[in-house]
UniProtKB/Swiss-Prot annotation:
PANTHER family in the cross-refs: 60S RIBOSOMAL PROTEIN L35/50S RIBOSOMAL PROTEIN L29 (PTHR10916), LARGE RIBOSOMAL SUBUNIT PROTEIN UL29C (PTHR10916:SF0)
CDD domains associated with the record: Ribosomal_L29_HIP
Pfam short name (any one): Ribosomal_L29
Name of encoding gene: rpmC
GO biological process, one term: translation
Annotated protein name in UniProt: Large ribosomal subunit protein uL29
Length: 63
């Protein structure tokens, strides 16, 4: 997910994207805790995507 693509989305779309990412992060964390997660790098990628979405939301709130 690119930050430039996120900047083109509306605030409502960003909020729904953030909600989806948070749900995905929760599911991945549960899989990691139970030892079912094979690709642990996805957890890091989702965490960074959440940070990107939050950054763009903050930028839009300030502008």
């Amino acid at each position: 997910m690119k930050a430039q693509d996120l900047r083109e989305k509306s605030v409502e779309e960003l909020n729904s994207e953030l909600l989806n990412l948070l749900k995905e992060q929760f599911n991945l964390r549960m899989q990691a805790a139970t030892g079912q997660l094979q690709q642990t790098h996805t957890l890091k990628a989702v965490r960074r995507d959440i940070a990107r979405v939050k950054t763009v939301l903050t930028e839009k709130a300030g502008a």
